Amino acid sequence: MLSAAEGILLSIATVEAGLGVLGNTFIALVNCMDWAKNNKLSMTGFLLIGLATSRIFIVWLLTLDAYAKLFYPSKYFSSSLIEIISYIWMTVNHLTVWFATSLSIFYFLKIANFSDCVFLWLKRRTDKAFVFLLGCLLTSWVISFSFVVKVMKDGKVNHRNRTSEMYWEKRQFTINYVFLNIGVISLFMMTLTACFLLIMSLWRHSRQMQSGVSGFRDLNTEAHVKAIKFLISFIILFVLYFIGVSIEIICIFIPENKLLFIFGFTTASIYPCCHSFILILSNSQLKQAFVKVLQGLKFF
């Protein structure tokens, strides 16, 4: 049985997960409908569909993992469920970060202004940048997958008092965890770099605008600010997600602390929930469709 605090926190996390599924499903449906209508899929549409779909899987995996650990711990650790979830989660997690990073790079190349020859070459050949990112994804996935296999083989299952708990030597587990996420961290660092360069581009553009009309904000400035807000929100929410997942994994060593585990689940669920609605509000097409849905609901 859960305590009152644990029950309340789990309810909050479940609501976050539900909103995350609804928000990301909406994003995927709107872009798929636009694809079917125009018989053409833009790069932004492709990235949004991929990001939304992968996040739906992430939410379901987080929820399934949390409920299985809380209510069926013996079956969870004694069966192959933990291995299945680990392999699927590792793959989907890489895809989610890759789509988010690719979207960040796309906004950066589209909006930023630099005279550097490498930047200008990438700006004209965006597809080359995505081929490079795809290579990074495949490389990091192969490395991470091999470490997941290693961790699962090294895991020792101990049956005591009808409870199955997986024990790993903590130092080795920490090393494995770092290597498991090295690809994700590398992609995340690309987003940080894109955000920093966008801020630099905005600063340079603002200095150039100082010679113009005072207080005038042109469309380029607005685009910079909008993209920077999007990137910063992703960075903050992804850090929360990473912290939440780390807390959940650490709780393997302290399975009796259910409150801490549920807190990790709640923290991790903030990212797919909140960022989906940030995407909806920051994208004009998604925002218009969302307003139409809200207006339609008023008639019921």
From Swiss-Prot:
Cytoplasmic side: 29-43, 109-128, 203-233, 281-300
Transmembrane region(s): 8-28, 44-64, 88-108, 129-149, 182-202, 234-254, 260-280
Record's keyword terms, sorted: G-protein coupled receptor, Glycoprotein, Membrane, Receptor, Sensory transduction, Taste, Transducer, Transmembrane, Transmembrane helix
GO biological process terms, semicolon-separated: sensory perception of bitter taste
Residue numbers on the Extracellular membrane side: 1-7, 65-87, 150-181, 255-259
Molecular function in Gene Ontology: bitter taste receptor activity; G protein-coupled receptor activity; taste receptor activity
Tissue and organ distribution: Expressed in subsets of taste receptor cells of the tongue and palate epithelium and exclusively in gustducin-positive cells. Expressed in gastric and duodenal tissues.
Function: Gustducin-coupled cycloheximide receptor implicated in the perception of bitter compounds in the oral cavity and the gastrointestinal tract. Signals through PLCB2 and the calcium-regulated cation channel TRPM5.
Annotated family: Belongs to the G-protein coupled receptor T2R family.
PANTHER family xref list: TASTE RECEPTOR TYPE 2 (PTHR11394), TASTE RECEPTOR TYPE 2 MEMBER 105 (PTHR11394:SF132)
Protein name: Taste receptor type 2 member 105
